[in-house]
Amino acid sequence: MREYNVKAAPISFLTILDIKKEEELNCHGKMTMTGYISDDEEEECLKILRGDVWEKIEAVGEKGDTEILFWGLVTDFSIERINDQKKMTLEITTGSCLLDREVHMRSFQNQNMTYKEIFRQICGEYEVDIIFESSLEDKTGQLVLQYAETDWEFFKRLSSRKNRYLVPESKMRGTRLFYGLPRGKKIDFSKNWDYKMQKDLAGFYRKKSNGILDISESDCLAFIFQVRENYRIGDYMEFQGIQFYIYKIISKYIKGEMIHEYYLMQEKGLAVPVDMLKNAAGCSLDAMVKEVKEDKVQVEILSDENKQQEINIFYPYATVYSTPDGTGWYCMPEPGDMVRLTIPGKQEGEAFVNSSVHAETESPDRKDPDFKVLKTKYQKEVRFTPNSIVITNNQGTRIELTDKEGIHLVSAHSVVLEAAEDVTISSDKGSLIAAGTSSVLLKQKGTSITLDKGISFTGGELRVQ
């Protein structure tokens, strides 16, 4: 439809001076509208603009029929007085901007969850309708982390994993997103239309070098034309037997009518490179151990907004030293311990859990830095002090190795020494003392000496010198 007039509501203009509209893949649609308002309307406009305003811009045909040009949220405005006239400018943005207001910290640690389910879960927190034009049923198979990103930024990054993109709805109230290219209508291309064709070589090389290997230069051939007709992203046309799809629109208000410039490309050329989690590289997130399995752990991230999720991903646990043959240090944390989930690079799938972090405690074990203590939750302990090593079960049994006094072994039960060959006990300068409250028995094969209220000897021969 060719417009005869343009009208706006609920904020209207006496005279429209200028309109600019831009729409593109992975971008919020925006329209800037400038015009005159009456003095009486200024106060009413300011009252309306105190809250969220959904502004609808329509083209009015010669016979009074209407067609929506743009419908979005007023995100900025200005009113100025010039030569006794009030000029107002509105910036209107598609409802997708509601997803781009706040940053979030969420983890998705269910490796059986699909990307589509992640989209659905987050959209459920808003009044957002999302239409999947491409399949997104793949399971994540790894950690998916939303780190200091808005939901809009997060959705774009997830979409890029399939070389896809988001397209916001620009002709309805509310928020609707398309994952992938919307199914548009065919454009009846007229041979009388002026057009331009150009090759986006910079875009081609950028995509090629970022993992999109099956793209060719001809896929990045752009077709551009200007008409008065109102089309939308996803509409397509055939030119020389090739289908070109609208991926970008720039509209201007020229001499009382809207002129639309459309950019089209083959669908294959619209693929976007995979976007990495750049701002999380090197970050460490405070977490609590949920479960331990062999040399891996499950964790709950303390700052996670997604608290009610099912967690079934185990992360490698960093240790002091380890080799594939099992050589090294094996000392795993316990459930409830505080640790750190570390993202070493730009892919959250590479995450691992780092060493435990000391929490506030009144335990005397952590008061003296000169004391090094290795202790389990079962109270089994090895303690290194400046002048001793103590091994104890904290239940009456211990071995002390001290610099001045030597070795002190205390047992709450029996002490058993066994050897396949000799056992030698000797003292270079002191005495050898064997003492027992009940008795003392020295035995060698069939010969024995028993000290029990008296001395008993058993054997074939006794020699006394």
Residue ranges and their predicted role:
Residues 1-465:
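Amphipathic alpha-helical and helix-coil boundary elements used as assembly
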